[in-house]
C-alpha cells in the first residue's frame, strides 16, 4: 500500500514539477542582474518587470519564436517564459514542409498547438510564410536559403498551402510576413522576390481581407536592392497589399546599421509614405560561435544584453518596429547551437538558464510602452569625452520626460567603465529625476549637487554614461 501511494505521489510530482521548474528559473528579485557597474549614487530600487497581461495598448516590440517548423527547438521548452518577458507579438514560421508531408494532405496540428497556446497566454501571432517543400519538384526545401518555389508544380502547391493556412488561421492571425531572407542563398533577383511577395500577399488578402502584411523580409540593409524590389511592386500597383517593409541586417556594432536604415526609410517613403519599417530579426550571441550572424567574436551574456537593448532602443528612436531574435537558443541540426537566445539550452528539450539579456529586455519593455511619445525636436545637448547617442520621450499620462542615452561609438564591451557627462535640456519635463541602468534595472538617486531644475531647464552633471542604455526620468515613471 505504501509503495503504491509513493508511486502515485511520484507520478503527480513528475506531472507538476517540470512546468514549475521552468517558471521558477525566472529570478524576480531586485538583484536579478548584477554587474560591475558603479555609479557612486544611492540605489533606490529596481524596475519591476511587466508581463504581457500587465501592458496595455500596442507595442514597438516583437519576439522571435522561430525554427519550430524544423524542430530545432520546441515550444514546450520555453513557452512559460514568453508572456513574463512582456513582448506581445511573437514571430512564428509557417513550416510548409512540416505541415504537408504527403501531397495534398495538411496536418496543422503542430502549429495549432503553438498558436492556440500562445493566444491563450495573451500573445499575438506574426506568421511568416516559409519555407519550401521537397515533396514537389522545384518547390525548394525546408531550410533557409534553399530558395522559394520556381516550377509550375511547386508554385501551384505553394498557393494551395498558403490558402489553406490563411483559411485555417483566419480570426486568429492578422499579422503576416513574407518568405524569410530571400536575398541570400540561391540567387533571387529583386523582380523574382517582388513578384513572389505579390503572389503570396494576394492569396492572404483574398482569404483575410484585413490581413496586415510585412513585405520582403530582406536579410540585407541595402537601400539600392530595396529600391529595386519596391519599384517592381509599385509598377504592378500592389504596394497597397502591404503595411510594413521588413528587413534584418546584423552589424557587430548595432549603431552602425542606422545610416543604411535611414537611407532605406527614404526609399520606402519615396514609394509609399504610408509604409512603416519593421526590423524583423536581430540578436546577438551570448558566447563565441563559429557559425551564423555575428560569429567569430568573444561575446558574453553582458555584451549580448548591451547589444540587444541598444538595438531595441535604436530601432525605437528611428521609428522602426523592433524584433528581438530570439527567445531561446536553438540547435541547428548539422551545424551548431545558435546562441542568440534570451534563454540558454542544454539541448532542444532542456533549458540551462535565463540569460542576462532576458532581464535586460524585460527592463526595456517595462518602461518603453505605448504611453511614451518620441520628442523629435527635443532640445538637449550632452557633453562627454565620447559622442553619446540619445532619444527623448514624454509620458502622455504622467507628463514626465524620459531621456535614454548610451555610448554607441563601438560594439559592446565586457567593461562597465563609465564616462561622466553634462546634460543640458531646455523645455524638459522633470520634477523628481532619477538615473536608471537598463541592463540591471537599477534605479539611482541623482544627488542634489548633480542636478539643477528651473523654469523647464534642466542641467545634470557627472552623469554616468557607458556602452549600454541608461536613462533619466522622473521617479513616478519607474517606481510605481
Indicate where each model-derived feature is located.
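Bacterial N-terminal signal peptides
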Residues: 9-16
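Noncatalytic carbohydrate-binding groove/subsite architecture in carbohydrate-active enzymes
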Residues: 190-311, 318
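Solvent-exposed beta-hairpin/edge-strand motifs
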Residues: 424-443
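Aromatic/acidic polysaccharide-binding cleft in carbohydrate-active enzymes
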Residues: 284-366, 376-383
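C-terminal beta-strand-rich structural cap/linker in extracellular carbohydrate-active enzymes
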Residues: 447-480
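Substrate-binding cleft and catalytic face of glycoside hydrolase catalytic domains
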Residues: 85-105, 110-242
Amino acid at each position: 500500500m505504501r509503495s503504491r501511494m509513493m508511486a502515485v505521489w511520484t507520478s503527480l510530482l513528475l506531472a507538476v514539477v517540470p512546468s514549475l521548474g521552468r517558471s521558477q528559473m525566472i529570478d524576480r528579485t531586485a538583484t536579478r542582474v548584477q554587474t560591475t557597474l558603479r555609479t557612486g549614487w544611492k540605489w533606490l530600487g529596481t524596475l519591476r518587470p511587466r508581463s504581457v497581461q500587465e501592458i496595455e495598448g500596442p507595442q514597438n516590440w516583437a519576439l522571435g519564436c522561430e525554427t519550430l517548423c524544423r524542430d530545432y527547438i520546441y515550444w514546450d521548452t520555453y513557452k512559460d517564459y514568453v508572456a513574463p518577458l512582456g513582448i506581445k507579438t511573437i514571430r512564428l514560421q509557417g513550416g510548409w514542409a512540416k505541415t504537408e508531408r504527403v501531397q495534398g494532405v495538411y496536418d496543422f496540428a503542430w502549429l495549432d498547438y503553438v498558436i492556440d497556446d500562445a493566444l491563450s497566454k495573451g500573445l499575438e501571432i506574426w506568421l511568416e510564410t516559409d519555407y519550401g517543400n521537397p515533396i514537389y519538384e522545384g518547390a525548394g526545401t525546408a531550410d533557409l536559403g534553399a530558395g522559394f518555389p520556381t516550377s509550375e508544380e511547386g508554385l501551384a502547391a505553394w498557393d494551395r498551402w498558403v490558402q489553406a493556412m490563411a483559411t485555417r488561421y483566419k480570426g486568429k492571425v492578422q499579422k503576416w510576413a513574407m518568405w524569410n531572407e530571400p536575398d541570400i542563398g540561391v540567387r533571387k533577383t529583386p523582380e523574382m522576390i517582388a513578384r513572389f511577395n505579390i503572389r503570396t500577399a494576394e492569396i492572404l488578402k483574398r482569404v483575410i481581407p484585413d490581413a496586415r502584411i510585412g513585405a520582403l523580409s530582406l536579410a540585407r540593409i541595402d537601400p539600392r536592392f530595396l529600391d529595386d524590389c519596391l519599384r517592381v511592386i509599385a509598377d504592378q500597383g500592389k504596394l497597397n497589399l502591404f503595411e510594413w517593409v521588413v528587413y534584418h541586417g546584423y552589424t557587430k556594432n548595432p549603431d552602425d546599421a542606422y545610416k543604411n536604415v535611414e537611407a532605406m526609410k527614404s526609399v520606402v517613403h519615396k514609394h509609399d509614405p504610408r509604409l512603416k519599417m519593421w526590423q524583423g530579426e536581430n540578436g546577438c550571441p551570448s558566447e563565441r560561435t563559429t557559425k551564423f550572424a555575428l560569429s567569430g567574436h568573444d561575446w558574453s551574456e553582458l555584451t549580448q544584453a548591451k547589444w540587444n537593448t541598444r538595438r531595441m532602443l535604436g530601432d525605437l528612436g528611428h521609428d522602426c518596429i523592433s524584433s528581438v531574435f530570439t527567445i531561446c537558443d536553438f540547435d541547428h541540426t548539422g551545424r551548431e547551437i545558435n546562441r542568440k537566445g534570451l534563454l540558454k539550452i542544454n539541448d532542444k528539450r532542456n533549458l540551462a538558464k535565463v540569460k542576462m539579456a532576458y532581464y535586460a529586455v524585460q527592463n526595456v519593455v517595462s518602461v518603453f510602452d505605448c504611453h511614451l511619445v518620441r520628442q523629435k525636436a527635443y532640445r538637449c545637448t550632452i557633453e562627454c569625452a565620447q559622442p553619446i547617442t540619445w532619444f527623448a520621450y514624454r509620458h502622455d499620462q504622467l507628463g514626465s520626460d524620459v531621456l535614454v542615452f548610451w555610448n554607441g561609438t563601438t560594439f559592446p564591451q565586457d567593461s562597465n567603465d563609465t564616462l561622466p557627462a553634462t546634460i543640458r535640456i531646455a523645455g524638459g519635463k522633470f520634477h523628481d529625476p532619477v538615473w536608471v541602468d537598463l541592463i540591471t534595472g537599477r534605479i539611482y538617486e541623482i544627488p542634489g549637487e548633480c542636478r539643477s531644475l528651473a523654469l523647464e531647464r534642466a542641467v545634470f552633471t557627472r552623469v554616468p554614461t557607458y556602452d549600454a542604455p541608461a536613462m533619466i526620468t522622473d521617479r513616478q515613471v519607474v517606481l510605481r
